[in-house]
Regions:
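Thiamine diphosphate
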Residues: 1-160
């Protein structure tokens, strides 16, 4: 393998069942379009993308056309990909297990404003407050980052 390598040891279990795979290469600063759609675009950043994928599948089963984009990088943002999202849908939901203030969702809102995006954007992430101790699932529920809360936020956007 040529180039830098990162080994990550997250808390808890991973989501990849078959992990003995060749290493994947990611183009620096490029997002990955996991699913195309036009009613709503869900932009996820980080491991919360697994929950986002489940929500997308659930909404697709209900007949909604939902795109899912894995941003991969918070910086630099893939502005070309985001401009394509702005052109293809009027509803965007950003999801990250990071701070709302100054996070990926904020950067997307800033770009949307610069691009005169007229659609609706809802950001989900960690509030700028003390989060009580608890299990990761309890903390996600508290912050509205559990799968059901993400689904409800997406559904509200779709029906507005």
């Amino acid at each position: 393998w040529v180039g830098p390598v990162a080994i990550r040891y997250p808390r808890g279990a991973g989501s990849v069942v078959e992990w003995r795979q060749p290493m994947q290469s990611y183009a620096h600063g490029r997002a990955r379009v996991l699913r195309e759609g036009s009613s709503l675009a869900i932009l996820s950043l980080g491991p919360i993308g697994v929950s986002a994928s489940h929500v997308v599948e659930r909404l697709q089963a209900e007949g909604y056309s939902v795109a899912h984009i894995d941003l991969v990088f918070a910086k630099p943002l893939d502005e070309a990909c985001l401009r394509a999202v702005f052109a293809s849908t009027q509803k965007i939901l950003t999801i990250e297990e990071g701070c709302l203030n100054g996070g990926g969702g904020s950067a997307i809102l800033q770009l949307a404003m610069q691009e005169d995006y007229a659609g609706r954007i809802k950001t989900l992430g960690l509030p700028d407050e003390f989060i009580p101790h608890g299990t990761p699932q309890e903390q996600k529920l508290y912050c509205g980052l559990d799968e059901e809360s993400i689904y409800q936020a997406a559904k509200r956007l779709l029906t507005q």
